A protein has these predicted regions:
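N-terminal Rossmann NAD(P)H-binding glycine-rich loop of SDR-like oxidoreductase domains
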Residues: 2-24
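N-terminal Rossmann-fold cofactor-binding loop
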Residues: 29-34, 50
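Active-site proximal helix/loop that lines the substrate pocket
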Residues: 34, 71-75, 111-114
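NAD(P)H-binding glycine-rich loop region in Rossmannoid oxidoreductase-like domains
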Residues: 43-86, 97
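Short glycine-/acidic-enriched loop or helix-start segments at secondary-structure transitions
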Residues: 13-15, 38, 77-78, 117-120
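SDR active-site strand-loop-helix element
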Residues: 5, 29, 66-70, 106-112
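Conserved Rossmann-fold NAD(P)-dependent oxidoreductase catalytic core, especially the SDR/UDP-sugar
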Residues: 25, 81, 86-130
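Short loop/helix-cap segments at secondary-structure boundaries that form the rim of catalytic
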Residues: 34-41
């Protein structure tokens, strides 16, 4: 079983579609509404939140792989605290749950925003500090 966070977003929903097309069993986390997209009816949906350790513990029962695609991207200073909480504490919760459940593979999806401000015309590659 594969568990996907961020399944209601652009990257997560496309990932799920790809996994289902390969015939894999997928479980995914949602907060409020189960999304409707091609293949979504084949997903085992679990209502929960990255900040709710118990929902993550439940979701990872019987899972061998986790794709962590969930994050908040915010540019407003008013949203900075919520963004940090979800992205830092939420990710820590996912990692800790993976360790507790002896997950074989954790894939963490991020964005170029993790690099912060970059000098103009500076090369961006995997050797950069973040």
């Amino acid at each position: 079983m594969i568990f996907v966070t961020g399944a209601t977003g652009l990257v997560g929903s496309h990932l799920i579609y790809s996994l289902i097309e390969k015939g894999l069993n997928v479980r995914a986390l949602y907060r409020k509404n189960i999304p409707v997209f091609k293949g979504s009816e084949q997903v085992q949906w679990i209502q929960g939140d990255l900040l709710d350790v118990n929902s993550l513990q439940e979701a990872m029962q019987g899972v061998t792989q986790v794709y962590h695609c969930a994050a908040i991207v915010a540019f407003s200073p008013k949203q900075a605290a919520a963004m940090l909480q979800a992205n830092v504490e939420g990710t820590a919760n996912v990692v800790n749950a993976c360790i507790q459940h002896q997950i074989q593979k954790l894939v963490y999806v991020s964005s170029v925003a993790a690099l912060g401000r970059i000098r103009e015309n500076a090369p961006v590659d995997e050797t950069m500090n973040w």
